[in-house]
Amino acid sequence: RKNGTPVTIRDPNDATALGIGMIHQHFKLIDVFSVLDNIILGAEDTKLGFLQKKKARQKVSELSDRYGLRVDLDAKVEDITVGMQQRVEILKMLYRDNEILIFDEPTAVLTPQEIDELMQIMKNLTAEGKSILFISHKLNEIMAVSDRVTVLRKGKYVGTVETKDTDKQALSNMMVGRPVQLQVSKEPAQPGKVVLDVK
């Protein structure tokens, strides 16, 4: 359902027509194309059969500024960082005017600094009225950016809770179906006799 209306999504074109876009864990970019070409590919604006690249560049630049997604539009994708490639994926979805963005394990390939930047980008997007579905098993990130959490276990719905009304312990229990010990206390290791001495 979208806005209470049942919908059928057979392919990415159906999703885009409904304003739904997905940022995959493994990016769907063409390395030898420029950033701009990757963003507009498949959604090219044409007039009398001619590509309106200047108009597309202006729209992408405006989106980039609006959401804090700075990236060199002329750089080749193969020459930019993984974090920048993710920004390109996000801009692709925004260029298509998607209102619902699905992030599939988006932090799996990012550095800690890039993760912090992504969290801020997601907050900027929601502040502008975008809806985000954030698929993750990283509880710290879920608690930092979500308003509501839905837990699935083995592909089945377990429950939905408001983030403000839960904690990592409760979410862990929902995820595995039993109480989970998040903090493990154990005695410091006691070394045994030397078995190899290298000089």
Language model regions located:
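Glycine-rich phosphate-binding loops of nucleotide-dependent enzymes
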Residues: 1-199
